[in-house]
Amino acid sequence: FTHGTIREWIEGMTVVVDTGEEHKITDGITPSGRLLGIYQNVFPLLTKETGALRASKPELHDDATGYNLWNTSIGPRQLLDQLVGSEGTLGIITSVTFRITPHKEHSMTTCIPIASKELLSSYIEIAKHHKSESIFMYDEGFMQLSERYHPTLTPFFVDTPYILLVTHTHFDKEKLHHTVKTFRSALPIEDYLLKTLEGVHTLSRILPTSFLYSLFDMYTSKTQLPITIANGLIVTVHDIPSFLYDLEEYLNTLGRLYSITGNIGSGHISITTAFDPQGRDYSKDISAYASSIFSIVKNYKGGISAVSGEGLARTPYLSYVYNDATLSIFRKIKEAWDPLSIL
């Protein structure tokens, strides 16, 4: 939440378009060749559909679902916005130029047991107010699996449905400790109940999704697959407690292993659930599962693709988020870039 979406950090890229031409796109360049033709098709389309796009613009800033057509800027930035998250469906991206942020050498993570979901929103707001760098959440299932297969790696709390890992960073170690101390004193919980992680060793182990997948593999002896179609959900921070309640109510009816995690500072939530790929109704079960999860998200006017910039990651379910008019615009954008459906 501190740094926004990946789209905001891209300064330029090199892309191979449908004709095989390679073009470098940055702010200020003048499109030429095939890229000029694409721009001449895209710009009038977006101008014509301004009303429809404004009406369907995601309410949540970090929602990356679909081609990013919401930016009102004029020029090459429009093309960059569309390419980021297109997952190779508009052009083949061969290089990317990112903006970077200075590395802050010192970090400290405060581990907070959340006894009640109703408290999550207030804890998140306190952490954001005290300039935390990141806020990661994991549930009791994640914690128990981690403790079982990697004892002492993750902080363990008894009878705690959710844990928040709030990370602060700074260039100066002394100032970092002062910031963390001030933050902890603002929390509505006794300090002795909190735990601290110095540095990034533990976080670098547990934050990658591969860590959770490995826990599932060990628990199920690789007889079930961790399904991640419900990764990247996003709702407002205010709605997180009731959203989690509705998710849990549904997930508990499945009788399956699941875990809820997420970079919760912006309302990002990811659900990983185990399914048997050899099951008779495997495909049907996955489809019903996705439909149920995304229906809950829709009830909260949330988004279904908040991971990185993967705008088309939930392509079969875009109709859960956008109406037919918007989906038609997406198709026209695709046709402008790749009329022969080469990509």
How should these model regions be labeled?
Residues 43, 47-75, 236-245, 249, ...:
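A short, flexible low-complexity segment enriched in Lys/Arg and Gly/Pro that occurs
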